[in-house]
From Swiss-Prot:
Composition bias, Polar residues: 65-89, 135-169
Function description: Sequence-specific RNA-binding protein which acts as a translational repressor in the basal unstimulated state but, following neuronal stimulation, acts as a translational activator. Does not bind to the cytoplasmic polyadenylation element (CPE), a uridine-rich sequence element within the mRNA 3'-UTR, but binds to a U-rich loop within a stem-loop structure. Required for the consolidation and maintenance of hippocampal-based long term memory. Inhibits differentiation of intermediate mesoderm from an early stage to inhibit pronephric differentiation but induce neural differentiation.
Biased composition (Low complexity): 13-48, 170-193
Record's protein name: Cytoplasmic polyadenylation element-binding protein 3
Tissue-wise expression: In embryos, expressed in the central nervous system, and intermediate and distal pronephric tubule segments of the embryonic kidney.
RRM domain span: 375-466, 483-565
SMART domains: RRM
Naturally occurring in which organism (per UniProt): Xenopus tropicalis (Western clawed frog)
Residue stretches of biased makeup (Basic and acidic residues): 1-11
Family: Belongs to the RRM CPEB family.
Listed transmembrane segments: none
Record's subunit section: Following synaptic activity, forms amyloid-like oligomers. Aggregation requires an intact actin cytoskeleton.
């Protein structure tokens, strides 16, 4: 009888066993393997498995499944259960999975997870992959019991390469057991330790901005500028906002904000993350704002360079006109984010008594040194009891120099008569060093100088920028020497651009202005030239004879004369009467305005009404002067 009962019971068990799903066998094998790998302490703290537990699978991690107690109260569909936490206070899952990351309602954002056909339909393919870590009170199962084979589960796990952040930190909650790390970590550690893995070199002490792309897009050091998993990520709206920055468990090593390789464009750039410009704007990805600000800093300077038109000249370009015209760029306050020629920054507006390149080094072009300043520097406001030797001692640290002032040889005095002097440096680089040592106030440069009775008296330093010697206002007009005037007595601080603006305001039609400089030191000589584009403006200027120059502190009455050339032929005989020689005389009267040789001058000006005209001749320094004509 007992044998019959045992046989009937075994047959009944055999009939029930095929009805069990294959997932139960897989689950039983998984439990046995996990129990073997777990330490005794973990097995003791694990609660017994209840037969009514409900199997659940992560909507985003098909290879990651777990069990959950069946809900006792009405709730949302299981598709939402993986996104929001159940309200439990279990911190073991968070601490053991991603230490140091502050979860938002129990969830975290993952932008590097691939889309999968098992993704929950709530999210869909157009949403950024997210993983909601629900707080569980039961042991988590790392493999899906419904997986067709074991190889697929391990393949899917290997795709999620985030193991540097995953740790095997034991659970601190008595209500949860440590997720058996044996199968998971053993599969991942081998992949993370390979040299070909680009993420394996991440160190715990690095800047969190350079961390793996968790919530902040693609991380730094990715071999491709695009996301290798989801290159064309679409705009999405989500109820989960992950913090773009997070604190790490390990201490951060102090690092400079701007590094030497900050502006590298290769994969070695560790400061500026690669940014996908083809991706639509992501309102929840705050990291794009940080990248945009950094891109603004390292953007090229083409918009500023575009301000240089025909009216400007750069030392590396061809001359705009026959004259060696140069830009009139500002000379002070050169910025480190824009390291190019200061001529690009000139705009002819506002106070430009100082230019923007004073502290910049000497430029070199094609191996040749390009000078920016005159070697002659004006120094004003000197102490009255300072002599030549003391002035030399005060400025010798910038380089060899000679101290000079007007009529020094005739006066035989060791003291500057009017409190100013000129410093003649041997090298132009000494002038730049002097400028760098000065203090700027109200657009002027000052340096403290001491005398026997006065200690640290500020004196004004006024260098001359070579780019201020010429200014082209209208580059489309050709320069006509016969429409050019000479301006005598120009104050030395006045620049070419300021002279052009004054003359254009008075007479109009100015196309060029220049300041005469000596050929050796290239310092202003106190005269200038202005070329007009039409005859009316030219005649109006020479007819006035005197002009009041007013600009800032400058207010001086200067003389205006026609600009006389010494290589012009006679306008009457074209050299036939004078043997082909150049005409020595120019008549500045508005009825003539011509060059004459001696024979033609006598012939033309013997007529009634012209006998009182005085010829102009060119003398040294481009200065025309009236000479009496000796009638024969």
């Amino acid at each position: 009888m007992q044998d019959d009962l045992l046989m009937d019971k075994s047959k009944a068990q055999q009939r029930q066993q095929p009805q069990q799903p294959p997932s139960s066998q897989t689950q039983q094998q998984q439990k046995e393997a996990a129990s073997v790998a777990e330490p005794p302490s973990s097995r003791e703290s694990s609660p017994p498995t209840h037969k009514d537990k409900m199997q659940m699978e992560s909507p985003l991690l098909p290879g990651l499944s777990f069990q959950q107690e069946p809900p006792t109260t009405p709730s949302l569909s299981p598709s939402f259960g993986s996104t929001w936490s159940t309200g439990g206070s279990n911190s073991a899952v968070d601490d053991s999975f991603f230490p140091g990351i502050t979860p938002v309602n129990g969830t975290m954002l993952f932008q590097n997870f691939p889309h999968h056909h098992h993704v929950n339909p709530v999210f869909g393919g157009t949403f950024s992959p997210q993983m909601g870590l629900a707080h569980q009170t039961q042991q988590q199962q790392r493999r899906s019991p419904a997986s067709p084979n074991n190889h697929t589960a391990y393949t899917q796990r290997n795709a999620y390469s985030h193991q540097p952040i995953l740790t095997n930190k034991p659970s601190s909650s008595p209500n949860s057991s440590s997720p058996s790390p044996s199968n998971w970590n053993n599969q991942q550690n081998a992949a993370w330790n390979t040299p070909s893995n680009p993420w394996g070199a991440m160190q715990p002490g690095r800047d969190p901005r350079r961390a793996v792309g968790v919530g902040v897009g693609v991380g730094v050091g990715v071999p491709s500028p695009l996301n290798p998993i989801s290159p064309l990520k679409k705009t999405f709206s989500s109820n989960v906002i992950a913090p773009p920055k997070f604190s790490r468990a390990s201490p951060l090593t102090p690092k400079s904000w701007v590094e030497d390789n900050a502006f590298r464009t290769d994969n070695g750039n560790t400061l500026l993350p690669l940014q996908d410009r083809n991706r639509p704007y992501d309102s929840f990805n705050l990291h794009t704002l940080e990248n945009s600000l950094m891109d603004m800093i390292r953007t090229d300077h083409e918009p500023l360079k575009a301000r240089m038109g025909l009216n400007f000249h750069h030392p590396g370009t061809d001359n705009i006109m026959a004259l060696n015209t140069r830009s009139y760029g500002r000379r002070r306050g050169r910025s480190s984010l824009f390291p190019f020629e200061d001529g690009f920054l000139g705009d002819g507006h506002g106070d430009q008594s100082l230019s923007s390149g004073l502290s910049s080094p000497t430029h070199c072009q094609n191996g040749e040194r390009i000078e920016r300043y005159s070697r002659k520097v004006f120094v004003g406001g000197l102490p009255p009891d300072i002599d030549e030797d003391e002035i030399t001692a005060s400025f010798r640290r910038f380089g060899p120099l000679v101290v000079d002032w007007p009529h020094k040889a005739e006066s035989k005095s060791y003291f500057p008569p009017k409190g100013y002097a000129f410093l003649l440096f041997q090298e132009e680089s000494s002038v730049q060093a002097l400028i760098d040592a000065c203090l700027e106030e109200d657009g002027k440069l000052y340096l403290c100088v001491s005398s026997p009775t006065i200690k640290d008296k500020p004196v004004q330093i006024r260098p001359w920028n070579l780019s201020d010697s010429d200014f082209v206002m209208d580059g489309s007009q050709p320069l006509d020497p016969r429409k050019t005037i000479f301006v005598g007595g120009v104050p030395r601080p006045l620049r070419a651009v300021e002279l052009a603006m004054i003359m254009d305001r008075l007479y109009g039609g100015v196309c060029y202005a220049g300041i005469d400089t000596d050929p050796e030191l290239k310092y202003p000589k106190g005269a200038g030239r202005v070329a007009f584009s039409n005859q009316q403006s030219y005649i109006a200027a020479i007819s006035a004879r005197f002009v009041q120059l007013q600009h800032n502190d400058i207010d001086k009455r200067v003389e205006v004369k026609p600009y006389v050339l010494d290589d012009q032929m006679c306008d009457e005989c074209q050299g036939t009467r004078c043997g082909g020689k150049f005409a020595p005389f120019f008549c500045a009267n508005v009825t003539c305005l011509q060059y004459y040789c001696e024979y033609c001058w006598a012939s033309i000006h013997s007529r009634a009404g012209r006998e009182f005209h005085k010829p102009l001749v060119k003398e040294g320094g481009d200065r025309p002067r009236h000479v009496p004509f000796h009638w024969s």
